[in-house]
């Protein structure tokens, strides 16, 4: 983040990269469902995790993560508002979040990047940040331009590959790290399977 933004109100946009290939990397129904669920929830869960683990109990009410709550829709922009972070929208692997200053945003960005990698093993999050103005329309236009610029120059990080003596997953090519359903899987596959509801798998397979 640019240093001049650290003390200013900012709008951040988060974009999960590689969603399609992540979800449909395998034909296993359980992994496809699990991957879809992980992608749908990853940003909001990451922000909730930050508030829970990095924000003091006294300040948690100043971090608004529930963007569906109409009662707090304009909480950040009200006069004399003390809200430090407010999620404005989440969907389709994207999220728009307002921060009272860039320093808070920077801390969240570092946490979220690590969280996404730990929970999905191979997805990346692109982050664009601009100074907030009084024009939401103009801010939306600028943040999307900035995101396109960021993504055009952002290398896609991948986990360390397998050594020649390490067994690998036949689908992903990643190192085998555990067993599920009596089969060997890499970390990415295990995380997908761990997030799925068995009842949903049964419903799909019955159709």
Model-derived regions: residue spans:
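Regulatory and interdomain segments flanking nucleotide-handling catalytic cores
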Residues: 1-207
């Amino acid at each position: 983040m640019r240093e001049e933004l650290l003390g200013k109100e900012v709008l951040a946009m988060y974009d999960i990269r590689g969603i399609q290939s992540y979800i449909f990397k395998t034909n296993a129904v359980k992994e496809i469902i699990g991957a879809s669920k992980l992608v749908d929830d990853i940003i909001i869960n990451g922000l909730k995790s930050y508030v829970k683990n990095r924000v003091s109990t006294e300040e948690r009410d100043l971090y608004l993560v529930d963007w569906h709550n109409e009662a707090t829709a304009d909480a950040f922009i009200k006069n004399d508002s003390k809200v430090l972070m407010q999620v404005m929208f989440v969907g389709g692997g994207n999220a728009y979040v307002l921060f009272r200053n860039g320093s808070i945003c920077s801390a969240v960005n570092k946490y979220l990047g690590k969280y996404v990698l730990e929970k999905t093993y191979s997805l990346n999050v692109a982050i664009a940040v601009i100074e907030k103005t009084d024009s939401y329309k103009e801010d939306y236009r600028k943040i999307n331009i900035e995101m396109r610029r960021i993504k055009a120059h952002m290398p896609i990080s991948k986990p360390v590959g397998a050594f020649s003596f390490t067994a690998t997953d036949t689908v992903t090519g990643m190192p085998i790290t555990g067993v599920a359903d009596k089969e060997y899987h890499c970390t990415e596959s295990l995380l997908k399977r761990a997030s799925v509801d068995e009842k949903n798998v049964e419903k799909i397979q019955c159709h």
